[in-house]
């Protein structure tokens, strides 16, 4: 309450001074504490405050180690692998912070943050690049039917439950963005994106896309993939989470 009262006075003074244009609304978006594993405020081992540059570098280093364990280093040249590790590490930190209700206190947990499972940045980055890979294969199999370009104009026919669940969730993107703008609570967008990615995983596992027949069904499912890719890309971009070209 003390902080809220302080900022109300600051905004009132700024308005009287003419620094705030008429009709402009200012609000203080209060945030909670970030705790270390010991339950105290996040600090270095020596007890000093954590520097953001050091924290992000450690995130990149940890992401690189996890990607090596997943054999990703063998699939990319060193330059691209370094770019991917940087995107995953920095994206993980950003997403972990924004996915928590901003007034809540949370524990800074590296293992949870850089995990490729659950509501995390790496999971959503992987889901997005996975859809991109579907379109790369679609373009490489032109003889099999419609490719990526056609998916942008194809109609969508709902033929299975997972398709319906995903399509309905995609329809809610606009409302979620409006809610985030009105409340200054980006964790709502994070929760939505996680739901989209989870529903897409179920859809992709249960509904053949590139092998779907007839060609009209293949085009329909590619169109649903395209809309999912658009939603995830927009959401992660708004959150400032980088998306690697491949993972």
Locate predicted features:
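Non-catalytic interaction-recognition regions
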Residues: 1-247
């Amino acid at each position: 309450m003390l902080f809220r009262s302080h900022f109300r006075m600051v905004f009132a003074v700024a308005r009287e001074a003419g620094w705030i244009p008429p009709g402009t609304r200012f609000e203080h978006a209060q945030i909670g504490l970030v705790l270390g594993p010991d339950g105290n405020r996040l600090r270095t081992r020596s007890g000093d405050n954590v520097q953001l540059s050091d924290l992000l570098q450690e995130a990149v280093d940890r992401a690189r180690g996890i990607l090596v364990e997943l054999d990703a280093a063998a699939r990319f040249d060193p330059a691209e692998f370094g770019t991917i590790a940087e995107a995953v590490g920095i994206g993980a930190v950003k997403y972990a912070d924004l996915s928590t209700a901003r007034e809540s206190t949370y524990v800074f947990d590296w293992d949870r943050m850089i995990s490729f499972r659950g509501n995390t940045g790496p999971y959503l980055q992987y889901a997005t690049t996975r859809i991109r890979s579907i379109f790369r294969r679609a373009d490489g199999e032109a003889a099999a039917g419609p490719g990526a370009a056609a998916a942008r104009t194809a109609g969508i026919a709902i033929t299975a439950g997972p398709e319906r669940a995903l399509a309905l969730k995609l329809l809610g993107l606009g409302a979620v963005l409006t809610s985030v703008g009105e409340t200054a609570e980006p964790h709502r967008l994070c929760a939505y994106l996680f739901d989209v990615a989870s529903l897409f995983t179920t859809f992709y596992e249960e509904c053949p896309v590139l092998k779907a027949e007839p060609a009209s069904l293949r085009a329909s499912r590619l169109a649903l993939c395209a809309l999912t890719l658009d939603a995830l890309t927009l959401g992660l971009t708004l959150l400032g989470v980088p998306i690697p070209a491949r993972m």
